[in-house]
Swiss-Prot record:
<comment type="similarity">
    <text>Belongs to the FlgM family.</text>
</comment>
<feature type="compositionally biased region" description="Low complexity">
    <location>
        <begin position="26"/>
        <end position="39"/>
    </location>
</feature>
<comment type="function">
    <text>Responsible for the coupling of flagellin expression to flagellar assembly by preventing expression of the flagellin genes when a component of the middle class of proteins is defective. It negatively regulates flagellar genes by inhibiting the activity of FliA by directly binding to FliA.</text>
</comment>
<keyword id="KW-0804">Transcription</keyword>
<protein>
    <recommendedName>
        <fullName>Negative regulator of flagellin synthesis</fullName>
    </recommendedName>
</protein>
<feature type="region of interest" description="Disordered">
    <location>
        <begin position="1"/>
        <end position="39"/>
    </location>
</feature>
<keyword id="KW-0805">Transcription regulation</keyword>
<dbReference type="GO" id="GO:0044781">
    <property type="term" value="P:bacterial-type flagellum organization"/>
</dbReference>
<keyword id="KW-0678">Repressor</keyword>
<dbReference type="InterPro" id="IPR031316">
    <property type="entry name" value="FlgM_C"/>
</dbReference>
<dbReference type="InterPro" id="IPR007412">
    <property type="entry name" value="FlgM"/>
</dbReference>
<dbReference type="GO" id="GO:0016989">
    <property type="term" value="F:sigma factor antagonist activity"/>
</dbReference>
<dbReference type="Pfam" id="PF04316">
    <property type="entry name" value="FlgM"/>
</dbReference>
<dbReference type="InterPro" id="IPR035890">
    <property type="entry name" value="Anti-sigma-28_factor_FlgM_sf"/>
</dbReference>
<dbReference type="GO" id="GO:0045861">
    <property type="term" value="P:negative regulation of proteolysis"/>
</dbReference>
<keyword id="KW-1005">Bacterial flagellum biogenesis</keyword>
Length: 97
Protein backbone atom coordinates (compact mmCIF):
# COMPACT_ATOMS: atom_id res chain seq x y z
CA UNK A 1 0.00 0.00 0.00
CA UNK A 2 1.41 3.33 -0.99
CA UNK A 3 0.45 6.69 0.36
CA UNK A 4 1.11 8.28 -3.03
CA UNK A 5 -1.68 6.29 -4.69
CA UNK A 6 -4.72 8.08 -3.37
CA UNK A 7 -7.87 8.80 -5.27
CA UNK A 8 -8.20 12.35 -6.61
CA UNK A 9 -10.34 14.75 -4.65
CA UNK A 10 -13.76 15.52 -6.04
CA UNK A 11 -15.28 18.97 -5.59
CA UNK A 12 -18.33 19.29 -3.39
CA UNK A 13 -21.54 19.94 -5.27
CA UNK A 14 -23.08 23.37 -4.81
CA UNK A 15 -25.78 23.86 -2.24
CA UNK A 16 -29.23 24.50 -3.65
CA UNK A 17 -30.99 27.42 -1.94
CA UNK A 18 -34.40 26.53 -0.57
CA UNK A 19 -37.48 28.61 -0.97
CA UNK A 20 -38.44 30.71 1.98
CA UNK A 21 -41.87 32.02 2.78
CA UNK A 22 -42.65 35.50 3.96
CA UNK A 23 -45.18 34.25 6.52
CA UNK A 24 -43.70 33.84 10.00
CA UNK A 25 -43.47 30.29 11.22
CA UNK A 26 -44.64 29.75 14.78
CA UNK A 27 -43.13 27.13 16.92
CA UNK A 28 -45.81 24.80 18.25
CA UNK A 29 -44.03 24.52 21.58
CA UNK A 30 -43.72 28.26 21.97
CA UNK A 31 -47.34 28.80 21.01
CA UNK A 32 -48.68 26.56 23.75
CA UNK A 33 -49.41 28.14 27.08
CA UNK A 34 -49.06 26.05 30.17
CA UNK A 35 -50.08 26.68 33.71
CA UNK A 36 -47.17 26.49 36.08
CA UNK A 37 -47.54 24.11 38.96
CA UNK A 38 -45.23 23.52 41.86
CA UNK A 39 -44.19 20.23 43.33
CA UNK A 40 -43.23 19.66 46.92
CA UNK A 41 -40.52 17.12 47.68
CA UNK A 42 -39.69 15.80 51.12
CA UNK A 43 -36.34 14.09 51.64
CA UNK A 44 -35.85 11.22 54.04
CA UNK A 45 -33.37 11.63 56.90
CA UNK A 46 -30.84 9.40 55.13
CA UNK A 47 -31.13 11.41 51.91
CA UNK A 48 -30.85 14.68 53.79
CA UNK A 49 -27.63 13.45 55.42
CA UNK A 50 -26.21 12.48 52.03
CA UNK A 51 -27.01 15.92 50.63
CA UNK A 52 -25.04 17.70 53.37
CA UNK A 53 -21.60 18.93 52.32
CA UNK A 54 -18.76 16.99 53.86
CA UNK A 55 -20.69 13.76 54.17
CA UNK A 56 -19.07 11.30 51.83
CA UNK A 57 -19.36 7.57 51.48
CA UNK A 58 -16.02 7.49 49.67
CA UNK A 59 -12.84 7.07 51.68
CA UNK A 60 -10.70 9.69 49.93
CA UNK A 61 -7.56 8.69 51.84
CA UNK A 62 -7.92 5.10 50.59
CA UNK A 63 -8.54 6.33 47.04
CA UNK A 64 -5.36 8.42 47.11
CA UNK A 65 -3.37 5.49 48.55
CA UNK A 66 -4.64 3.24 45.74
CA UNK A 67 -3.80 5.86 43.11
CA UNK A 68 -0.27 6.15 44.49
CA UNK A 69 0.18 2.37 44.57
CA UNK A 70 -1.02 2.09 40.96
CA UNK A 71 1.23 4.93 39.86
CA UNK A 72 4.25 3.31 41.54
CA UNK A 73 3.38 -0.17 40.25
CA UNK A 74 3.03 -1.49 43.79
CA UNK A 75 -0.65 -2.46 43.79
CA UNK A 76 -1.07 -6.20 44.28
CA UNK A 77 -4.38 -7.65 43.11
CA UNK A 78 -5.69 -10.95 44.48
CA UNK A 79 -7.65 -12.14 41.45
CA UNK A 80 -8.92 -15.21 43.30
CA UNK A 81 -10.43 -13.04 46.02
CA UNK A 82 -12.05 -10.78 43.41
CA UNK A 83 -13.46 -13.78 41.53
CA UNK A 84 -14.84 -15.31 44.74
CA UNK A 85 -16.55 -12.04 45.65
CA UNK A 86 -18.10 -11.75 42.18
CA UNK A 87 -19.39 -15.33 42.32
CA UNK A 88 -20.83 -14.81 45.81
CA UNK A 89 -22.57 -11.62 44.73
CA UNK A 90 -24.00 -13.32 41.63
CA UNK A 91 -25.29 -16.21 43.77
CA UNK A 92 -26.94 -13.79 46.19
CA UNK A 93 -28.57 -11.94 43.30
CA UNK A 94 -29.89 -15.21 41.86
CA UNK A 95 -31.26 -16.32 45.24
CA UNK A 96 -33.03 -13.01 45.84
CA UNK A 97 -34.79 -13.17 42.45
Amino acid sequence: MSIDRTSPLKPVSTVQPRETTDAPVTNSRAAKTTASTSTSVTLSDAQAKLMQPGSSDINLERVEALKLAIRNGELKMDTGKIADALINEAQQDLQSN
